[in-house]
From Swiss-Prot:
Family from the record: Belongs to the SurE nucleotidase family.
Entry's localization field: Cytoplasm
Binding positions for a divalent metal cation per the UniProt entry: 8-9, 39, 91
Superkingdom classification of source: Bacteria
Gene behind the chain: surE
Cofactor binding mode and count: Binds 1 divalent metal cation per subunit.
Cofactor(s) for this UniProt protein: a divalent metal cation
Name of the protein described by the UniProt record: 5'-nucleotidase SurE
EC top class named in words: hydrolase
Entry-linked Pfam families: SurE (PF01975)
Taxonomic lineage from the root: Bacteria, Pseudomonadati, Pseudomonadota, Gammaproteobacteria, Moraxellales
Length: 255
């Protein structure tokens, strides 16, 4: 099996190094990732300048572009062979609820949505993960991803991917299939004056998780709930954002 690994934390991030090491027993692993951090780029592609992939080690490439650029290049001519699976991560920080709209980790996985197997976006969730600087800090999460793939990935409809969040806890309680939760409104922007006397702004922190009432008949909970309770969250998400439930009513209202 040929496995493509990308991320949004950059090619030298410890999370992607741990993931590559863990997946090598499953086949050929090729890392193609941004040359520096590109968090928050979602599915953005670079269309206004050339991209420059540079091989920095055997089967490791750095690209002066976005996470989605890395996967797009890899699937469309950078290599003379095809990939069977795209795995994006391991991200330093959670990608839960509304965060998937902004996530470069998820965006890279969505570029692999038409592969032979469902693409995977994987993130390590916890308050301390952004300070981790060694691949051993991601070892438990990387092993979980290895085992998840080795067992055989569950089938998904076309153009769907797995968004996986692994809590950073000493002992995982298990795995839960989850739905995408949501956040309250983001915190307000903050204003500062830089050393040159110019007004600058920081985008506010993400809003707190919202506890939705149970939306489906089974006991399936949100991704926030699973991670908060030390379970790995596995959420199937799709590229098609159409709300089919309201199509006919909307059509009637315009008729």
């Amino acid at each position: 099996m040929n496995i493509l690994i990308a991320n949004d934390d950059g090619v030298f991030a410890p999370g992607i190094q741990a993931l590559a090491d863990a997946l090598k027993p499953l086949g050929r692993v090729v890392v193609v990732a941004p040359e520096s951090e590109r968090s928050g780029f979602s599915s953005a592609l670079t269309l206004d300048r050339p991209l420059r992939p540079i091989q920095i080690a055997e089967d490791v490439w750095a690209v002066n572009g976005t996470p989605a650029d890395c996967v797009y290049l890899s699937m469309n001519g950078l290599f003379d062979f095809e990939f069977d699976l795209v795995v994006s991560g391991i991200n330093s920080g959670a990608n839960l609820g509304d965060d998937v709209l902004y996530s470069g980790t998820v965006g890279a996985a969505f570029e692999g949505r038409l592969m032979k197997q469902p693409a995977i976006a994987v993130s390590l969730a916890g308050p301390d993960v952004r300070s981790y600087d060694h691949k051993d800090d991601y070892a438990q999460a990387a092993k979980w991803v290895h085992d998840f793939i080795a067992k055989g990935l569950p089938a998904l409809p076309p153009r769907h991917i797995f968004n996986i969040n692994i809590p950073d806890v000493p002992q995982l309680k298990g795995t839960q299939i989850t739905y995408q939760g949501r956040r309250a409104q983001s915190k307000p922007i903050t204003s500062h004056v830089d050393p040159r006397g110019r007004q600058v702004y920081w985008i506010g922190l993400a809003g707190e998780a919202v506890t939705d009432p149970q939306r489906i008949a089974s006991q399936i909970q949100s991704d926030f709930f699973a991670v908060a309770n030390s379970f790995v969250s596995v959420t199937p998400i799709q590229m098609d954002a159409t709300n089919y439930a309201v199509l006919e009513d909307l059509q009637a209202s315009l008729g």
